[in-house]
Amino acid sequence: MPVRKQDTQRALHLLEEYRSKLSQTEDRQLRSSIERVISIFQSNLFQALIDIQEFYEVTLLDNPKCVDHSKQCEPVQPGNPWESGSLSSAAVTSESLPGGLSPPVEKYRYQDEEVLPSERISPQVPNEVLGPELVHVSEKSLSEIENVHGFVSHSHISPIKPTEAVPPSSPIVPVTPALPVPAESPVVLPSTPQANPPPVLVNTDSLETPTYVNGTDADYEYEEITLERGNSGLGFSIAGGTDNPHIGDDSSIFITKIITGGAAAQDGRLRVNDCILRVNEADVRDVTHSKAVEALKEAGSIVRLYVKRRKAFRKNHEIKLIKGPKGLGFSIAGGVGNQHIPGDNSIYVTKIIEGGAAHKDGKLQIGDKLLAVNSVCLEEVTHEEAVTALKNTSDFVYLKAAKPTSMYINDGYAPPDITNSSSQSVDNHVSPSSYLGQTPASPARYSPISKAVLGDDEITREPRKVVLHRGSTGLGFNIVGGEDGEGIFISFILAGGPADLSGELRKGDRIISVNSVDLRAASHEQAAAALKNAGQAVTIVAQYRPEEYSRFEAKIHDLRETMMNSSVSSGSGSLRTSQKRSLYVRALFDYDKTKDSGLPSQGLNFKFGDILHVINASDDEWWQARQVTPDGESDEVGVIPSKRRVEKKERARLKTVKFNSKTRGDKGEIPDDMGSKGLKHVTSNASDSESSYHEYGCSKGGQEEYVLSYEPVNQQEVNYTRPVIILGPMKDRVNDDLISEFPDKFGSCVPHTTRPKRDYEVDGRDYHFVTSREQMEKDIQEHKFIEAGQYNNHLYGTSVQSVRAVAEKGKHCILDVSGNAIKRLQIAQLYPISIFIKPKSMENIMEMNKRLTDEQARKTFERAVRLEQEFTEHFTAIVQGDTLEDIYNQVKQIIEEQSGPYIWVPAKEKL
């Protein structure tokens, strides 16, 4: 019997009667479920479905009404008419819908095997007694794991039952189970009528009433995410808990940071602001922060996370722009093969150019997703195709864009952002929160607007409380200040450290207090002691004061210039030559004689990497030297500052405690990270992103910080072609260009692995396949590998012998490794040509890689600074340039000059 409106009204009346009888406390959950079903019956969508059914039954199936003067319509046969029965039970399922409207479940299941549904459908939290069933295992291709990370991830995609979800194209909202059954959980449905609601999942898990943030269960979607713990953990950070609510009074455990390269980032489904409900079988709702951390630590190697997140709603809008002298006036990022947001091929607006057409119009905003330009669709296209479509437009351009929305409106903090720690040309990430929430009137927490876009006036200037949990590397930031009551400021945030992962501290913050210890008038030493002795959980009250910090920086800069240009009173004014000492050194800094007013006689200019023949080193303050060029020694003799003078002046300049600097030991020591326990942080492409930072703190026992000045060298003849290691921004482009332009001069070596050989692979061509893991671990401990890592429980590494094999064939072996590998090659008597690309500024980086946003350029610049600080003494040369072509030409020239057969290598003697 067909369902009519009067049947719906009768069912609604029965439900309301039944609800009125549920007055007991134990009936609360059932009452809530009934109220939700009642709201469904009263919704416009449900009424529209009834109208469609009546039209279907009365009009389309009535043959006489289908007759036309020109032709006769065939009657439409119902594929699956509504079953007979009373609606009093409200048993509406996807199988009980009209045949013409029921979702193509089997077809979608087939599609699900080919397309990861994580972006379209979020599976519900499964029943507690069921483990994850694997229907698809995501495995990266061989080419994608050539550069092995220590972070490992396999995506375990849980099955999506046919009655639990429908494709995005279907407007039908599945509702299950039949009511009234008290054991079932509330139905997840929109609480307000929607013209075209997205697919909604039915929550049939056994969780009790969940904790909500400014919304009801209908505002959320649920997902089970299975991660395989890598050697560096799960790759995300959390905040919240009953003892430290993250948002308002909500004690939920929130994801605050996705670490690039980690298990979560490679899986791609977990997002910032996701709320963790359960870790494996451990319920982490309404627990303390430490309990949540403990649950994650004890979860084992395979970790099932049950999360909820606010549903994403986007509002499409059309924009008409008139091209001006500056064109359309905005920049884009993203596209197939160049994802701006992990797992999303969409084209995003990353920059609005002041004075351009988009800026004048005011409707297009950073973070908007472009759907079409004129009649050209921009969904699932490459970056180049999108650029071409935008370029090939007339003066009048019609854009269709989706406005990203924010999750929380009434919060003034800037968002914690996802940063990419290995800056490549395709690194363009904005906060994944661009998926979520409502459009804010101003920049709000977890809005898609990155920190780089927010002006200083848009960041809260009020004091705020930040709780950090000290890691193995300390708190992860530097402080400066503390003289004459000027305050203590944060001058540097270490990428990947606790401060960076929290996302709540920034350069320019003034520290007001630490664990209730007032630091407003503290000296630098007092602030350092307070931070060092604060324990594991450190509560910091900070206030963003960029103007004060800028004035402080300017004062430090002026002081630095004064000190470097001043004459040191201890200098004798003339050289003492009673005991002449001659040696060859390599300069580890640039020196401009015009800026040194204390010179006793004519000075000698030099740059980093220059070889100097010191012909008189008897004076404590000044040496006499000649410059050594590829053509021989120069005739010009000049005065240079001695090692002692350089180090004394630099230590005076650096009279600050650096919480992220490591105390350098003897440079001749082998880095103690090549044992099997060290594999987790010895990765093959960490050169742009990772450095080995020890515990932050002051120098102990009066030990002075290592200062770069000169390195003693000897000339040596080599009978091999030197390996090449290029570090810094744009290194991958330079490496590729070298191999492409000179395939006969540059090559790569074959790595080793303990992974079993695949059918199409050839031993010695694709990999050197090692049958014994124990043997490879032993070789690693014996320093036979310059770098090694673990992926999917298999070891991968680059051996000294593989590099030597390429070198002995007369080719430069291009190595994509970290700075640590330079020292290991030197110990193996394979002296590499190591070149550091030093960016001039953030603007310089953005000019060479126009796809980067301001924030990404800043992060790239900071990584380059840390890289230079960590490995400067190992660099053969440092290059700078305004363009990539300029840098490439310098690199080629350096390689040609340093190829040998006579090269300068570090000497064993000390200065």
UniProtKB/Swiss-Prot annotation:
Subcellular location: Cell membrane; Basolateral cell membrane; Endoplasmic reticulum membrane; Postsynaptic density
One cellular component (GO) term of this entry: postsynaptic density
Occurrences of domain SH3 (ranges): 580-650
Phosphoserine found at: S39, S122, S138, S158, S232, S567, S572, S574, S578, S597, S618, S684, S687, S841
Domain L27 residue range list: 4-64
SUPFAM superfamilies cross-referenced by the UniProt entry: L27 domain, P-loop containing nucleoside triphosphate hydrolases, PDZ domain-like, SH3-domain
UniProt key word Cell membrane: yes
Composition skew (Polar residues), residue ranges: 83-96, 419-441
Family classification: Belongs to the MAGUK family.
This protein's domain notes: The PDZ domains may also mediate association to membranes by binding to EPB41 and ADGRA2 together with the L27 domain that binds CASK and DLG2. The L27 domain may regulate DLG1 self-association. The N-terminal alternatively spliced region is capable of binding several SH3 domains and also moderates the level of protein oligomerization.
Protein name: Disks large homolog 1
Species of the source: Rattus norvegicus (Rat)
Gene name of this polypeptide: Dlg1
